[in-house]
């Protein structure tokens, strides 16, 4: 989900069959449409019980500024957590979730790299999530 509409669709879909809490781990890419960041935060706040904001592909942009943009219009949400290290964000969110909860890790999908500070680094959301679940994903 790289767009507000995409994030909204997937969260609405997951919400429809989630018995427990819905957790959302996401960030926005750097050097991309800055205008969508706040709206993605608002959508996550409306549809998810717990939000973890993290780095996606910040590229050459300041990751703190990206997260601040996302967070800027999230008002009175009871659980918004910021962890810039994406692997740690996924691991800790999975560990905080309970049986019956659903954790959405949005943004990178099939990508097996992350652009940070102008460097392409090997990284897989899927591999990190599987490891966090003890290989059960």
Where are the regions that the model predicts?
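ATP-dependent carboxylate-amine ligase
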Residues: 1-137
